[in-house]
């Protein structure tokens, strides 16, 4: 069968495991945004730590079907891009991994604009915004055009990382995205094991 007519053409071994299906939202409930007074951009340390552990766990668990070169990490803010690139390099150094065997941080971690026109097998999206004040909103994270670009870069799996209690205040995220994804409640603490970070899976409505 052709890829168009065969529904299994886009099925991958990791889709059968909690947290790695085709559409997933990781709820980093303890995540907290930080705004740089100089750049006015935002970052989120908890999300950054989780994203790095997530991509390395995926590659380690499914070595035969996941290539780090085919993974992309998209960030909604430039400061988060810088933070994630730093964490990626730190992870390689801490684990004493040969950096020559892995793609550069610049090539896999980019802003929404940096990924426009590209496609990766697995895409992790760091939404960044996380604040207890509902009136503050989530800024241009709710911009439909940027969301469209970010959410259409994945060929097999789209893994969204964010703070649900903040994002669901946005009509676009709350009604269109989060309610239609598998939600994994996850601990963002970088000291926890990969298995401990996966949390509890809750089935949401399908498309």
Language model segments and positions:
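Helicase-core coupling region on the C-terminal RecA-like lobe
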Residues: 1-57, 118-120, 151-154, 160-207
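Eukaryotic intrinsically disordered and solvent-exposed regulatory patches
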Residues: 9-12, 57-60, 108-111, 144-147
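Short, glycine-/Ser/Thr-/acidic-enriched flexible segments
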Residues: 30-31, 78-80, 114-116, 129-130, ...
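Feature representing long, continuous alpha-helical segments
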Residues: 49-53, 78, 82, 86, ...
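Conserved helicase motor "Helicase C" RecA-like lobe of SF1/SF2 P-loop NTPases
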Residues: 56-109
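A short beta-strand element within the Helicase C-terminal
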Residues: 110, 114-130, 149, 157-161
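Cytochrome P450 core scaffold surrounding the K-helix E-X-X-R motif
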Residues: 131-135
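Conserved SF2 helicase motif VI
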Residues: 136-158
């Amino acid at each position: 069968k052709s890829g168009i007519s065969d529904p299994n053409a886009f099925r991958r071994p990791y889709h059968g495991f909690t947290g790695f299906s085709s559409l997933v939202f990781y709820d980093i409930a303890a995540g907290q945004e930080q705004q740089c007074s100089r750049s006015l951009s935002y970052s989120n340390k908890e999300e950054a730590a989780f994203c790095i552990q997530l991509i390395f766990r995926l590659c380690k668990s499914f070595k035969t079907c996941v290539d780090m070169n085919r993974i992309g990490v998209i960030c909604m803010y430039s400061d988060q891009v810088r933070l994630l690139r730093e964490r990626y390099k730190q992870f390689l150094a801490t684990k004493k991994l040969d950096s020559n065997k892995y793609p550069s941080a610049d090539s896999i971690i980019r802003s929404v604009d940096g990924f426009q026109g590209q496609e990766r097998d697995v895409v992790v999206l760091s939404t960044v915004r996380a604040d207890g004040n509902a009136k503050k909103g989530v800024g241009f994270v709710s911009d439909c055009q940027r969301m469209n670009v970010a959410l259409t870069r994945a060929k097999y799996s789209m893994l969204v990382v964010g703070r649900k209690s903040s994002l669901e205040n946005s009509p676009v995220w709350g009604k269109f995205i989060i309610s239609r994804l598998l939600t994994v409640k996850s601990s963002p603490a970088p000291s926890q094991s990969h298995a401990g970070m996966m949390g509890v899976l809750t089935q949401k409505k399908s498309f």
